[in-house]
C-alpha cells in the first residue's frame, strides 16, 4: 500500500489486479492468508482457542443461524461440529484482497468444506464463499468480520475405505487432540 500502488485513491489490486504489489502489501496478504488457514484448521480440529485467536475480541460473524460475536461463535460451533461430524475439512482458495488502507482489508475467498457424518456413511459437502474483513492493530492482523455465503450444499453417501487396502496402514486423522498434527506442530 505504498503510494505507487494506488490508482485514483484505491489500492492497485482493486483496479488493476495484475499490478505487482509492494512489500508491505505482500506481507499483509501473507498474514491474512495465514489467518484464513488457521481458521480452517481450528474448525477441523475442533479448537475454540485456535478459532478465537484469528479474531479481534470485538469481531462479529454472520453464519446464517448465528449472528454475533466471533468469540461466542467459537464456543458454540465446537459442540455442533463434534456432535454431528466425525471429521471435517475446510479448504479456502481463490482469495481476492481489497485493501482500503494499510491497516484494513476486505477479502472474498471460496470455501469447499466436507463434513463426514458421525455414522461414517454420508458426508455433507458445502461450497460457498467467505466475505471477511481484517484489521491490523499494533502490527498484528486479525479478523473483524465474517459473512458466510452459500452457493450450494449437498449430502452424499460414502463408502468408508480408511481401513481397507493400501489405506489401512496410514495414520488416521481426528478432530480431537489425538490428531498427529497437535504434536507435529507443537
Task: Describe the residue ranges of each PLM region.
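Short, low-complexity N-terminal intrinsically disordered segments enriched in polar/charged residues
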Residues: 2-41, 45, 49, 53
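Short, conserved clusters of charged catalytic residues that mark active-site
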Residues: 34, 92, 129
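Acidic/histidine-enriched, glycine/proline-rich intrinsically disordered or flexible terminal extensions
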Residues: 156-186
Amino acid at each position: 500500500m505504498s503510494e505507487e500502488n494506488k490508482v485514483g485513491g484505491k489500492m492497485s489490486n482493486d483496479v488493476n489486479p495484475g499490478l505487482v504489489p509492494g512489500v508491505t502489501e505482500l506481507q499483509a496478504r501473507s498474514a491474512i492468508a495465514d489467518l484464513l488457514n488457521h481458521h480452517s484448521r481450528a474448525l477441523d480440529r475442533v479448537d475454540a482457542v485456535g478459532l478465537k485467536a484469528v479474531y479481534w475480541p470485538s469481531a462479529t460473524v454472520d453464519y446464517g443461524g448465528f449472528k454475533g460475536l466471533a468469540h461466542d461463535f467459537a464456543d458454540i460451533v465446537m459442540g455442533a461440529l463434534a456432535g454431528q461430524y466425525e471429521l471435517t475439512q475446510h479448504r479456502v482458495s481463490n482469495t481476492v484482497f481489497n485493501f482500503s488502507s494499510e491497516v484494513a482489508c476486505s477479502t472474498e475467498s471460496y470455501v469447499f468444506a466436507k463434513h463426514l457424518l458421525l455414522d461414517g456413511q454420508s458426508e455433507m459437502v458445502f461450497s460457498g464463499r467467505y466475505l471477511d474483513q481484517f484489521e491490523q492493530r499494533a502490527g498484528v492482523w486479525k479478523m473483524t468480520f465474517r459473512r458466510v455465503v452459500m452457493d450450494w450444499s449437498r449430502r452424499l453417501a460414502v463408502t468408508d475405505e480408511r481401513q481397507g487396502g493400501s489405506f489401512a496402514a496410514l495414520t488416521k486423522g481426528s478432530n480431537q487432540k489425538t490428531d498427529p498434527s497437535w504434536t507435529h506442530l507443537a
